[in-house]
Amino acid sequence: MERAEEPVVYQKLLPWEPSLESEEEVEEEETSEALVLNPRRHQDSSRNKAGGLPGTWARVVAALLLLAVGCSLAVRQLQNQGRSTGSLGSVAPPPGGHSHGPGVYHHGAIISPAGRELLVAGGNVVDAGVGAALCLAVVHPHATGLGAMFWGLFHDSSSGNSTALTSGPAQTLAPGLGLPAALPTLHLLHARFGRLPWPRLLVGPTTLAQEGFLVDTPLARALVARGTEGLCPLLCHADGTPLGAGARATNPQLAAVLRSAALAPTSDLAGDALLSLLAGDLGVEVPSAVPRPTLEPAEQLPVPQGILFTTPSPSAGPELLALLEAALRSGAPIPDPCPPFLQTAVSPESSALAAVDSSGSVLLLTSSLNCSFGSAHLSPSTGVLLSNLVAKSTTSAWACPLILRGSLDDTEADVLGLVASGTPDVARAMTHTLLRHLAARPPTQAQHQHQGQQEPTEHPSTCGQGTLLQVAAHTEHAHVSSVPHACCPFQGF
């Protein structure tokens, strides 16, 4: 007998470190009752099930998905389509629960509605993350989209392997317009590590594009700052003024592209239909050879506390590892959170999301159009905004997801993931955050130590605009925190 669905509650997410003060949580025995979904959905072991652990339904479905830039909008979209709603704020925990540092812990799932649906349907963190990224491509065209470049980092707790996802080098489709890479990149990731059928992941974003979504505050602000030139009629009123927060936007052309992509059997074909339509719009030939996305072993750096993983060049991952290694070797005080590092002429607009389950499987995704609304060139036949990422040799300074695993030999080792969105300054602050985490957790420390609260003295906002996500798995718990504190609502089940 399934447990009745309870009202959804959203909470503010707090910066977290192992030494922070305790916070009560729902008792494990009570929470596990809500995790017994349809057991038949989790019995198929014929495919690669990223992060799945046999024999424990709670650990299979205990997943967390946090969307940095777009989860608040995804929450509102699905709420306005008749889903259960909740109130902002925190809920007093029941007495008698065990304690953790402040933040969000759960034995079950704490996710966005888009990701929640895919997990309930039997998906894993890769399904949830890819599905949510495609929803963001619809509802946050200023930060991401089908025209964006994606980087990803996936850690599979069952194998201990970490894999980097790249879109391939940037390539010009037409002067000032970058070749779109999102669909083949996400399709490749899902084909290797996902569990649900690919078409299932496109149901949500296709519905949002076809039936419409409500413009949220970040998108409305971006429209005011950028102006509507090149963005009409998608994001404009009939008189040419930008849509404000709460206005409804539809993108039926994009919905048609997504329906076509749902039928693609391979990652190469996933973007071909879109590319043909774009070439027709622009009056150019389809490139004879286009960069293909890749999955490759992640860059590694052994540290006393475990092993760090990140994405390879031309992302900022290798440079960040070098900075971390130098800081750890020197033994000097933790550097300024905003060092003069990875200077770029452009401060790109980017989007990030993270997914983690309580077994320690982690997916980090970050994407960018290079600047707000990319090139601001709206393809009339596809509804896609193209990026202006056209330089092959340019370092993607906005892309540097990091994962710290306590030990490769221990399948139950703690896992920490960090991913940032915004300007390169936020990535520098992420380096500072990880150094503080390593300093607070020496190699001999095996468990959380509940001490008085030690609020971080610096936040990424001191460097620039953006969001920093921190996700973790510890003793069969999924945990998340973020800076700014209230950037990212979540939904539990």
Curated annotation (Swiss-Prot):
Similarity comment: family membership: Belongs to the gamma-glutamyltransferase family.
UniProt feature, compositional bias: Acidic residues: 20-32
EC number: 3.4.19.13, 2.3.2.2
Extracellular side, ranges: 76-493
Cytoplasmic side: 1-54
One Gene Ontology cellular component: membrane
Topology versus the membrane: Single-pass type II membrane protein
Catalytic activity: an N-terminal (5-L-glutamyl)-[peptide] + an alpha-amino acid = 5-L-glutamyl amino acid + an N-terminal L-alpha-aminoacyl-[peptide]; glutathione + H2O = L-cysteinylglycine + L-glutamate; an S-substituted glutathione + H2O = an S-substituted L-cysteinylglycine + L-glutamate
Stored Gene3D superfamilies: 3.60.20.40
Skewed-composition ranges (Low complexity): 442-455
PTM (free text): Cleaved by autocatalysis into a large and a small subunit and the autocatalytic cleavage is essential to the functional activation of the enzyme.
Main location: membrane
Name used for this protein in its record: Glutathione hydrolase 6
Membrane-crossing segments per the record: 55-75
InterPro entries reported for this sequence: Gamma-glutamyltransfase, GGT_ssub, Ntn_hydrolases_N
Sequence segments annotated as region (Disordered): 19-52, 83-105, 442-464
Pathway linked to the protein: Sulfur metabolism; glutathione metabolism
Function: Hydrolyzes and transfers gamma-glutamyl moieties from glutathione and other gamma-glutamyl compounds to acceptors.
Subunit structure: Heterodimer composed of the light and heavy chains. The active site is located in the light chain.
Keyword terms of this UniProt record: Acyltransferase, Glutathione biosynthesis, Glycoprotein, Hydrolase, Membrane, Signal-anchor, Transferase, Transmembrane, Transmembrane helix, Zymogen
Biological process annotations from GO: glutathione biosynthetic process; leukotriene D4 biosynthetic process
